[in-house]
């Protein structure tokens, strides 16, 4: 804003008129030529401050050599509240002091200062108040308005911080498998009666009875898989495996009482090298590593068998403790188990919560709409299962309520300090007002949420170009706001993708800065329909002053 400081400076001229050769009318003409430029013409919040740069240009002869002038910028806002800036003192050339000297030949004075932001400053004006001092007299001078309004667009940003609750691994449908097996004698395909009465088969039968009696179970498939131990040659073992598959298929009818499924799958594997490898890995055989190296070096079954037989001492132990466990047929039933529904979980959490495992407790907490109940369930999961995810979610609930100290206590207790925990700690520091500490945590976390939060820190610090770069491609309106404040209106327009009230507000600002009056009206009308509170705020916003 450019002003002639006529009232302010004329008084100084009048005060010193007796010592000057110029007439009063000439002094008035000089005062008319004094100009004050305010940059920006409309003040704006940048970070935590409202910066101002004043440039005063004055003509030759306006300042008496023995006069002094105190000038105080004052921001008047809200219902008449005032915030005074620093007082600047100027002196004539013959004053013996250490203030800025104003030459009688004229010149320019520049001052930079800032105001702290306070609520209500969207409706404000900046004025200069002066006191002239000459020959022992102090005369207050009339105030001069130099700027109107404060742009607070930065405050539209969502400054809460981005974080997500830890998810549960609850499965609506559990894929399960139950099995039993029968063992065969060396080179035999006969299923002995004792095998059908073995513990393995009894446990399988009990499991099948439970599956049949529980409507939550659905059988997906049943298979009989037969094997031969890798001894005696590949061709011979292939036939032996086939014979065992046939005998096992008949045995299955006895195991199930004749209820063989229509989709029974029967497979013959032949030599069971995979089972052999697993058995060796889990054994305490002295030359275990050597045997495993042979398996990795050779793929030909005959070569493998020959090399292992050459280890005579080892082969005796293998023949005694490993091969017998591979002469078998497996009965496998695969089922789907329909887990508790959300409604059932909620009911169980109220009357029999100890039935729930960790995943069930995390799921029922996640679907609860009552924050207090969520916290109760997460705390139960912490107490019963020492659940880090539940503890993290307790921290997230605290952040929701902007209780950063409570959140940090939970986060510090988590055993696995992963990137999500680091990001959440950054949000807690952000809510505590320590943006530098928050930024450090966000950099350590390195997640997409942390990157967006780092952009938010740049935005709140007033580093708009850096903020726009960090927030590019993120959800929400913060990226668009950073683009607006960085002067990238086209990028800002493209960045707003949602249709919420805050987005309409941002679109209206973009339209206003582009001089699009119709766009301003359209988006403010949309804002009124979507968010009455923000609409009322927009009515005071200096961004739209030219369109009212």
Sequence positions of predicted segments:
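N-terminal targeting segments with Sec-dependent signals, encompassing both cleavable signal peptides
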Residues: 2-239, 243-507, 511-540, 545-546
């Amino acid at each position: 804003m450019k002003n002639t400081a006529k009232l302010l400076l004329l008084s100084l001229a009048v005060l010193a008129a007796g010592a000057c050769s110029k007439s009063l009318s000439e002094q008035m003409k000089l005062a008319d030529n004094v100009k004050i430029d305010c940059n920006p013409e409309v003040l704006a919040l940048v970070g935590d401050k409202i910066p101002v740069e004043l440039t005063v240009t004055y003509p030759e002869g306006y300042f008496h050599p023995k006069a002094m002038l105190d000038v105080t910028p004052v921001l008047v806002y809200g219902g008449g509240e005032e915030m005074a800036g620093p007082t600047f003192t100027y002196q004539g050339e013959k004053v013996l002091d250490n203030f800025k000297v104003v030459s009688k030949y004229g010149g320019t004075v520049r001052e930079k200062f800032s105001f702290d932001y306070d609520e209500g400053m969207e409706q404000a004006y900046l004025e200069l108040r002066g006191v002239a001092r000459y020959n022992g007299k102090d005369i207050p001078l009339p105030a001069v308005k130099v700027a109107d309004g404060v742009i607070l667009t930065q405050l539209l940003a969502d400054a809460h911080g981005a974080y997500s609750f830890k998810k549960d691994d609850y499965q609506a449908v559990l894929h399960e498998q139950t099995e039993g097996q029968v063992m065969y004698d060396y080179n035999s395909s006969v299923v002995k009666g004792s095998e059908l009465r073995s513990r393995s088969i009894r446990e399988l039968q009990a499991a099948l009875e439970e599956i049949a009696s529980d409507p939550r179970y659905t059988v997906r498939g049943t298979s009989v898989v037969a094997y031969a131990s890798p001894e005696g040659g590949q061709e011979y073992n292939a036939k032996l495996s086939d014979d065992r598959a046939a005998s096992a298929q008949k045995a299955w009818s006895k195991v199930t009482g004749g209820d063989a499924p229509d989709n029974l799958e029967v497979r013959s594997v032949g030599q069971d090298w995979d089972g052999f490898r697993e058995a060796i890995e889990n054994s305490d055989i002295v030359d275990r590593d050597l045997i495993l190296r042979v398996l990795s070096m050779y793929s030909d079954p005959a070569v493998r068998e020959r090399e292992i037989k050459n280890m005579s001492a080892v082969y005796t132990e293998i023949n005694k403790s490993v091969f017998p466990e591979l002469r078998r047929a497996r009965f496998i039933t695969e089922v789907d188990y329909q887990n508790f529904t959300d409604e059932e979980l909620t009911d169980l959490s109220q009357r029999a919560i100890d039935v729930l495992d960790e995943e069930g407790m995390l799921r029922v907490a996640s679907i609860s709409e009552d924050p207090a109940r969520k916290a109760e369930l997460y705390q139960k999961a912490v107490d019963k299962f020492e659940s880090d995810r539940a503890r993290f979610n307790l921290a997230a609930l605290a952040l929701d309520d902007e209780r950063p100290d409570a959140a940090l206590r939970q986060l510090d207790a988590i055993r696995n300090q992963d990137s999500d925990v680091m990001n959440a700690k950054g949000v807690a520091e952000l809510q505590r007002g320590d943006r530098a500490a928050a930024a450090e945590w966000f950099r350590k976390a390195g997640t997409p949420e942390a990157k967006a939060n780092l952009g938010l820190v740049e935005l709140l610090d007033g580093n708009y170009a850096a903020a726009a770069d960090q927030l590019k491609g993120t959800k929400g309106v913060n990226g668009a706001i950073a683009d607006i404040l960085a002067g990238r209106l086209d990028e800002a327009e493209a960045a707003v993708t949602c249709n919420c009230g805050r987005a309409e507000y941002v679109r209206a600002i973009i339209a206003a800065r582009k001089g699009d009056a119709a766009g301003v009206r359209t988006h403010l009308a949309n804002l009124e329909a979507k968010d009455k509170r923000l609409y009322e705020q927009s009515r005071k916003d200096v961004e739209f002053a030219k369109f009212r």
